[in-house]
């Protein structure tokens, strides 16, 4: 689903931070300032947003995985909802150091999480003492909070979508180290350096965050749908050729 400049205006995408907190590297994307607040140039944001969505759509069409990352308070619920809507992995609580760079160890914790979920389902819990069962439930809750969003992510993601590149410095550093492309929302107070697909915009308003996250989720679903259509189309063409061959 395409987004218009009016929708961006209504969501407050153009409101940056106080002028004294700005990053000079964001100068090309700033329109001016009003009441000591930087105003982001939505003409540029819209074009860059569309470029980022095209990239996400293409990646999803090629069976790529995009990891959603948004752990600050106003982003958590939105990131989780939109990632789940499009069946993508997400990190909505704390970014654990090594989540990408030490993925092998993280996978062991994810295996433990899966094993514990099996124990909960197959009645193993009933055979434990009350204290053991309670300890297990607590550990499961803790693991689910940290790793629940990536428990079905078998390999490193092909790209990462980040709300607030300053807040998610750890995630950005790890992705860059591994050469994982980053689609990032960059507000006027942060540097766009190291972000492959920069979307200049407000990273604090929940309306703006919803607009970005919904856009990425929609692009992923569209990309997957496009891939299915191409397969179906290919099958039809092959069938037509086969029929034509038989008739010839």
Swiss-Prot record:
Membrane-spanning segments: none
Keywords, A to Z? Ribonucleoprotein, Ribosomal protein
- Which PROSITE patterns does this one have? RIBOSOMAL_S2_1 (PS00962)
Top-level taxon of the source organism: Bacteria
Question: Biological process (GO) annotations?
Answer: translation
* GO molecular function ontology, one term from the record: structural constituent of ribosome
Gene3D superfamilies annotated for this entry? Glucose-6-phosphate isomerase like protein, domain 1 (3.40.50.10490), Helix hairpin bin (1.10.287.610)
Q: Name one GO cellular component term.
A: cytosolic small ribosomal subunit
Q: Which InterPro entries match?
A: Ribosomal_uS2, Ribosomal_uS2_bac/mit/plastid, Ribosomal_uS2_CS, Ribosomal_uS2_flav_dom_sf
Protein family membership: Belongs to the universal ribosomal protein uS2 family.
UniProt cross-references to PANTHER family, sorted A to Z: 30S RIBOSOMAL PROTEIN S2 PROKARYOTIC AND ORGANELLAR (PTHR12534), SMALL RIBOSOMAL SUBUNIT PROTEIN US2M (PTHR12534:SF0)
Quote the HAMAP family the UniProt record gives: Ribosomal_uS2_B
Q: What is the recorded name of this protein?
A: Small ribosomal subunit protein uS2
């Amino acid at each position: 689903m395409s987004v218009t400049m009016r929708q961006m205006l209504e969501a407050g995408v153009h409101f940056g931070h106080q002028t004294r907190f700005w990053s000079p590297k964001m100068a090309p994307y700033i329109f001016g300032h009003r009441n000591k607040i930087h105003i982001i140039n939505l003409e540029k944001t819209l074009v860059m947003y569309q470029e980022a969505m095209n990239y996400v759509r293409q990646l999803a069409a090629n069976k790529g995985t995009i990891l959603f990352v948004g752990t600050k308070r106003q982003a958590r619920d939105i990131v989780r909802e939109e990632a789940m809507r499009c069946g993508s992995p997400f990190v909505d609580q704390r970014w654990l150091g090594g989540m990408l760079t030490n993925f092998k160890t993280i996978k062991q914790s994810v295996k433990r999480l899966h094993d514990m979920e099996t124990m909960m389902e197959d009645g193993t819990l009933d055979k434990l003492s009350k204290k053991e069962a309670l300890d297990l439930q607590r550990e499961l809750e803790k693991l689910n909070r940290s790793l629940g969003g990536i428990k079905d992510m078998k390999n490193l993601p092909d790209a990462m979508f980040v709300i607030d590149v300053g807040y998610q410095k750890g995630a950005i550093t790890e992705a860059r180290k591994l050469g994982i492309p980053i689609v990032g929302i960059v507000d006027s107070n942060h540097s766009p350096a190291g972000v492959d697909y920069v979307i200049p915009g407000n990273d604090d308003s929940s309306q703006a965050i919803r607009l970005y996250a919904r856009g990425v989720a929609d692009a992923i679903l569209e990309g997957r749908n496009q891939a299915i259509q191409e397969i179906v189309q290919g099958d039809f063409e092959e069938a037509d050729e086969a029929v034509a061959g038989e008739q010839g």
